[in-house]
Structures are given as structure tokens and as C-alpha cells.
Amino acid sequence: MVYLWRAVDAEGEVLDVLVQSKRNKHAALKLMRKLLKKYAFAPERLVTDDLRSYAPAARDLGIEHLHERGRWRNNRAENSHQPTRRRERKMQRFKSAGSAQRFLSAHAAVYNTFNVRRHLTSAQSHRVLRAAAMTTWREVVAAA
């Protein structure tokens, strides 16, 4: 059994994905340290579910004053899990935690490229953003 840890910003972009075999303080610390190192600044808020592993990890990093926990507060992260869960069911599970980590990291980058917040843009803006995303995608595929 593996657990999916996902960090999502306020706009719904996936910041990072981590696949771990445990849901404990050490795993929570690993994700938080990875994010703090990658982005080099503390977040405005850290919203999590009621898992008790987050509070000690935030305390160890000195960001416990930013930590908000509770039911329904982390809906953005939970909703970003849904496509992954559907895809995982279709693929009959991943063969290993490593293959899940590689796939999900690549998928997050592609998702962020094509994730246009449609309800906040006009049709014209949406078409322009979508065309830019497709151009980027074609460049990446051609380089590979």
C-alpha cells in the first residue's frame, strides 16, 4: 500500500507529488522540506486534512502558526486527486511506488500546462491560453 501526498497551491496548480509507503511524521516532513527547498519561501497558509502527522512536521519546521487543519478545508488538494485515482483504477494500479512517482510527477507538469481556469477567462482568452499550451506541448514532444 502506498500513499499519495500532493501539494496544491491556491490556484489549483500541483506544486509537488510524493509517493510514500507510510503516512507518518517522517513522510509529512519529507514533502514539506521538499517544497520549502524547491520554492525557497514559507507559504501564507498550510491547509491539511485531520491527519495527525502534519502538526508535528510543521512544528519541527517552525511553520506551525501557518497550519490550518480541518474537514473540508483541503478540498482543492482532494479534488486534484480525482483524475489520478480514476487513471490508477483503469491502469489496474501502478506496478511499484517508483513507477507511480515517475508517472505522477510527469503528469503534474502536463496538468499544470493545460489547466486553464476556464470559469475565470473569456472564450477568446481561453482559446489563446489553450493554443499557447499546445505550442509548448508540441515543442516538448519534438525535443524528446
Where are these regions (language model features)?
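RNase H-like nuclease fold core
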Residues: 1-42
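Mobile genetic element proteins and their domesticated derivatives, centered on retroelements
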Residues: 7, 12, 32, 46-49, ...
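Conserved, non-catalytic sequence blocks in retroelement Pol enzymes and Pol-derived host proteins
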Residues: 19-23, 41, 47, 94-99
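Short, aromatic/basic amphipathic alpha-helical patches
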Residues: 52-62
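Short hydrophobic/aromatic-enriched beta-strand-loop microsegments
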Residues: 62-71
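RNase H-like two-metal-ion nuclease catalytic core shared by retroviral integrases
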Residues: 70-86, 95, 100
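C-terminal domain-tail junction helix/linker
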Residues: 90, 101-144
